[in-house]
Amino acid sequence: MKIIVGGGISGLWLAAELKARNIPCCVIEKSALGQGQTLASQGMIHGGTKYALDGLLTKAASEIGAMPARWKHALKGEGTVDLSRVQLEREDQLLWSVESIAANLLGFFASKAMRSRMERIDPESEAAFDHPNFNGHLYRLSEPVLKLDTLVHAFAEILDGQVFQAEVTQLLTQDDKVVGVETSAGQFHGDVILTAGEGIEMLLSGLAGSYPVMQRRPLAMAVCKLTQPIPKVFGHQLGSGSKPKLTVSTHEFDGAQYLYLGGQLAEDGVTQDDDTVCANAKRALSEALSWLEPKVESIHIFRINRAEPSTREGNRPDTAFVSKLNNLIVAWPTKLALAPALADQVLQLLDEESKSATLPQWPKAPEGHYPWV
């Protein structure tokens, strides 16, 4: 039995891959499926274009480049993981500027390396940019945006009867090997795979020996409730730096429209208090979409940690991370889009021999909700 600790996207995708191969497995989640970093994300399955905004196709951009196609394959119901029930917010994302773009960057965007990832489009083709006061550049990225609650629901259906709610309090060991988990619902024995994001650190701290070190890269996301709706926007505003100045996704809850803001705004907001981030968010939004004149009723800040394997300078890891020490597998996807790549790496480390196993009689893990609403 493969015991997957953590019911975020990495654990869910991995479990679906195991189930498709008839490898007995279960997912143990302490709160609700997707409740951590998964539902806190903006649902954008990007292929690394935003990592190439300095005019260089970096390792990170190359590694993640195949992921949109992999996800689209699953969203069509093809391959081992059938996500055809997942709803899309959009089939693509937008990249825009409200100021001039450096000539070298324009040339890079038009290069052969980037043509398969993006195309420049007429603003008239997009409702949010079809306005005489928009004078910038507009690109379409062939990278889907998912309605994340439907993604979690699809996995809950695929894995019905295999996802359990319990808090793993420690790892059970015997002869220096991990042989199972101690949970709030009882003990369970099997091969353990940790995909618990930020929760991995505590579980590893109880083990003897050397294990991967975790880092946290926090974000201060801004949630803007509008007084009246604007055309939906899903994409990234170009700035002068190597990261998107602002990343915008649009959501509707209880008849109200919300803009969920990330990008450089959320990076900078980590060291700022909420009032400062709110003021900066309002200003950034009015600059990024000035022609739409978005009217903000209220703003609140949602802070979230990105849990990842430690890097030398605390920077973003380029790829999904999987490590096997003795018989324990530790995994961080590092990005929502990289969940399939993480599953591929884990599968290479497993003994895929199918063995019968009895599942625990524990409560079913509920589906999570957007934590920032």
Identify what each model region corresponds to.
Residues 191-325:
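Active-site substrate-recognition segment that forms the wall
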Residues 164-180:
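A conserved short coil-to-beta-strand element within the FAD-binding core of flavoproteins
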Residues 19-41:
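Glycine-rich FAD pyrophosphate-binding loop
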Residues 122-159, 264, 325-333:
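Helix-loop-beta segment of a Rossmann-like dinucleotide-binding subdomain
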Residues 289-373:
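C-terminal catalytic lobe of FAD-dependent flavoproteins
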